[in-house]
Amino acid sequence: MTQDDPIARALDGIRDLYAGNLATHGRDSKSVGWKDEASQLVRFDRLARVVDGRDAGCTANDWGCGYGAMFSFLDGRLGDALTGYTGYDISQDMLDAAARSIDSPKARFVLGREVTGEADYTFVSGTFNVKLDTAAADWDRYVKDSLRAIYARSRRGLAFNLLTTYVDWKQDTLFYADPSEFFDFCKRHLSRYVTLVHDYQLYEWTMLVHREPSA
C-alpha cells in the first residue's frame, strides 16, 4: 500500500480514530467502537464457536486486536486449551494498552497491517466496520482480499463479523455487508464448511469458516 492508496489513507485515519478513542475512554469497549462490554461479549461468544470442541490445544491470531479483550475472553473460555495467541493491530497505542494489562506467556502483540504468522484459528471482530470515506466497492474488495490472506494462515478455521445490511439506517463512514453475498464468497473461495450466524440481537452477523467439518 502507498499513501495515495485509498485503503492506506483509510487505515491511517482508522488508527488515529481508535488512538483518540483510547485516550478518551481508556481500556474499554467504547474505545474499539462497541456500545458496551455486554454486546462485546456476545460477539466474542459467536466468534469462539469456530473452535472445535475436540481440540486438545490450539493457537489463535486476532487481527485488529485492540487492547486485547479477545485474548481475555478466549483464555477464560478455553483455559489450558489455548496454547498461544498473537494479536495484530495498526495502533501502537492499542498494543501498548494490551501489553500493560495482559501478563501471560501465551500472549504476544504485533504492530502491522497483515497477519504474518500461522495459527489454528483467526478471529476478526469489528476490524472491517469503519471505512471512513472510502468507496464501499473499494472497501469490499479490501475485505475480501484480506479474508483470503488471513484464511491462508489459519490451519483450522476463521471467524469474522461484519455489520449487516438488514438495518433501518446506515452511517456513511461504516461498512455494511450482505450476509448472503459473503456466505457465497466464503463457500466459493475459502471452504466448503461455512456457517452463517445471524440469529442474535446485534445489527451484524458472524461467519465461521472451517477447513474440516465441525464437530
Language-model segments: residues:
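N-terminal, positively charged/glycine-rich alpha-helical extensions of SAM-dependent methyltransferases
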Residues: 1-29
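Conserved alpha-helix/loop element of class I SAM-dependent methyltransferases that forms part
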Residues: 38-56, 73
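Short acidic low-complexity segments
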Residues: 109-118
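A short SAM/SAH-binding and catalytic strip from SAM-dependent methyltransferases
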Residues: 121-140
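Short "lid" loop at the C-terminus of a central beta-strand within the Rossmann-like core
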Residues: 128-130, 163-168
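Conserved beta-strand signature within the Rossmann-like core of class I S-adenosyl-L-methionine
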Residues: 154-162
